[in-house]
């Protein structure tokens, strides 16, 4: 099951962004700029930035998420967003004795497909652990023959075994990560991944991340969400045709966060 937490962010992110942007047009000291910003002035300045398309100051605010219960399929997608920092559970150093996996909703909804999927996952887990064991025994024997003490040999052999045994693991295999993005990167991430055409799992993640950051920085993320929230759908013939519904959905999310 996917879980997402906002574990850290820039203190007073909107005030920091407003001060950074204000500095571009002022000869005042930074401390004076910060002290001169109340909530109303900050909101006004951020709205002006958005209207002008002056986005670089937004990069001064960053947000760090703890993400668990997602698949390696999602990992391959989220790391395409290159202006971000990722720390991911290693399949090289962590042996997956407790093999967990993500079941896609469309498979979950069809009993026969779900049964076949679970059977496949169980077989994959068995093959993975069997291969890891065989590799570990083989590496241990070789290292001990080379004169390494057994305890040290087994520790080294275990890591070597994990490195190659992971090749049989499926994309459904669960992983966990810590991800940090600046606000501008998040705006782009939401623009692309909250869209109904995004793959279901990363769309679910993007929506959860949006729900977490919006209450912290509502003016920065006022126009965030899929592209159609703040303008016409850019998908052309591939448009889902549900722009009004999507806008209503994100309006409700923002309204709920403001309560």
Residue ranges and their predicted role:
Residues 1-259:
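Family-specific signature for flavin-dependent thymidylate synthase
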């Amino acid at each position: 099951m996917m879980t997402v937490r906002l574990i850290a962010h820039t203190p007073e992110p909107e005030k920091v962004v407003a001060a950074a942007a204000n500095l571009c047009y002022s000869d005042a000291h930074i401390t004076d700029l910060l002290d001169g910003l109340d909530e109303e002035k900050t909101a006004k300045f951020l709205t002006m930035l958005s209207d002008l398309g002056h986005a670089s100051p937004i990069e001064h605010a960053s947000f760090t998420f703890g993400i668990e219960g997602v698949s390696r399929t999602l990992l391959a997608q989220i790391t395409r967003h290159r202006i971000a920092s990722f720390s991911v559970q290693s399949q090289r150093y962590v042996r997956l004795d407790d093999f967990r996996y993500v079941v896609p909703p469309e498979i979950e909804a069809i009993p026969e497909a779900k049964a076949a999927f679970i059977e496949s996952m169980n077989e994959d887990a068995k093959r993975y652990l069997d291969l890891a064991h065989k590799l570990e025994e083989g590496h241990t024997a070789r290292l001990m023959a080379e004169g390494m003490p057994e305890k040290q040999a087994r520790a080294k052999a275990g890591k070597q075994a994990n490195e190659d045994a992971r090749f049989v693991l499926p994309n459904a295999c669960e992983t966990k990560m810590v991800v940090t993005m600046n606000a501008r990167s998040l705006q782009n991430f939401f623009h692309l991944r909250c869209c109904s055409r995004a793959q279901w799992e990363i769309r679910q993640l993007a929506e959860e991340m949006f729900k977490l950051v919006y209450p912290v920085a509502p003016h920065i993320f006022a126009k965030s969400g899929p592209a159609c929230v703040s303008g016409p759908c850019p998908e052309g013939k591939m448009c889902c045709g549900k722009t009004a519904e999507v806008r209503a959905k994100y309006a409700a999310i923002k309204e709920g966060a403001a309560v």
